Amino acid sequence: MVKTVALLTAGGLAPCLSSAVGGLIERYTEMSPETNIILYLNGYKGLLLGEKVLVTPAMRLQAHVLHTVGGSCIGNSRVKMANVADCVKRGLVKEGQDPRQVAADQLIKDGVDVLHTIGGDDTNTAAADLAAYLKAHGYTLRVIGLPKTIDNDIVPVRQSLGAMTAAEQASRFFQNVVAEQTANPRVLLVHEVMGRSCGYLTAQAADYYRAQLAHREFAPELGHTRERYDIHAVYVPEMTIDLKAEAARLRAVMERVGCVNIFLSEGAGINDIVAEMTAKGETVPRDPFGHVKIDLINPGAWFGKQFGGMVGADKVLVQKSGYFSRSAPANAEDLRLIKGMVDLAVDCALRGEAGLIGHDEERNGVLRAIEFERVKGAKAFNIDHPWFTHLLNEIGQPKGAKVSVAHGDE
């Protein structure tokens, strides 16, 4: 019997977190109503500080509402327990304490049998490490993770929770913002999309955007042309960018159409920006995981500055869809995916299994509990997907060479 389970969400937001929490509460209420459910607040921070809520009968009745909610109803944080100095600095543990021991003591104190972690590869492998640590100290904890990341970059998971919704929302964001190219002559409009080292979100958002564009009605005689509302370039970290060649191609677009619209993954060209900052002796801001804080170095503005003059733009406008996209509630496709994974997660918990729930690309796409030792991040977006190749051909953009990218973020 599983007496007590605990849930936490961690890493960046994605359009699945609240729904997954609600789904787990609903499924346990259905399959094992006697099981106690603990919600650790604000991710691993709450676990380390003992900040938690015990789910009440009234809360169970309200769980269905969470399927319509964005963000994380129980809060998130970015905490790397292996980074002891950062944990001490933030007041999560005291000097001389091991964060793993502090977390383990809290789980033992709370009598947790199963820990459900909803996050990316860092979140879930950290939980697996914690379970191994507890086992070595004589306490059995099963960890069952759910794969959350808008980058869809977890190996070997076919589709992570929230990524489809985030791409749809990025497309929706640009459906409004694209009209800004009419505010001034010769506008270079850069849509900066989240994606540290994976171009999935940028590419999928571009594909979704062009799909809806095909069904829109235009009035070319009145200046409302499809070309002005189309995408003229898509840049992702996994593909090289020949700046000079692209500038020449897009300058021709500017002369013909009167504007240039670009979908740019924030991770595209990040190495060039970091190298430039380092050469100037500037400090590159990083988070507790060692990842570059992309929002502070502003890739879109850097790219626009490099490109604006080359394409003959009178105005450069950079618009970021990241927070708009990742904070949305899950769409219908993601809700179906969440339901399937949540149901299996609870079933696995009650059967005594552990692992990261997902469609295993290395096991014929079967939905199963994937062994944690096989889980890792930085799954690159495949630029050779037929649909992406078709997209590039449609907009007249030559495909660049493949690029190996560094480990991503949640």
Curated annotation (Swiss-Prot):
GO terms for cellular component: cytoplasm. Catalyzes the phosphorylation of D-fructose 6-phosphate, the first committing step of glycolysis. Uses inorganic phosphate (PPi) as phosphoryl donor instead of ATP like common ATP-dependent phosphofructokinases (ATP-PFKs), which renders the reaction reversible, and can thus function both in glycolysis and gluconeogenesis. Consistently, PPi-PFK can replace the enzymes of both the forward (ATP-PFK) and reverse (fructose-bisphosphatase (FBPase)) reactions. Pathway: Carbohydrate degradation; glycolysis; D-glyceraldehyde 3-phosphate and glycerone phosphate from D-glucose: step 3/4. The record marks D122 as: Important for catalytic activity and substrate specificity. Homodimer or homotetramer. Gene3D superfamilies: 3.40.50.450. The active site is at D151. Its cofactor is Mg(2+). It is an enzyme of class 2 (transferase). Transmembrane segments: none annotated. This is Pyrophosphate--fructose 6-phosphate 1-phosphotransferase. One of its GO terms (molecular function) is 6-phosphofructokinase activity. The keyword Repeat does not apply. It comes from Mastigamoeba balamuthi. It catalyses: beta-D-fructose 6-phosphate + diphosphate = beta-D-fructose 1,6-bisphosphate + phosphate + H(+). One of its GO terms (biological process) is fructose 6-phosphate metabolic process.
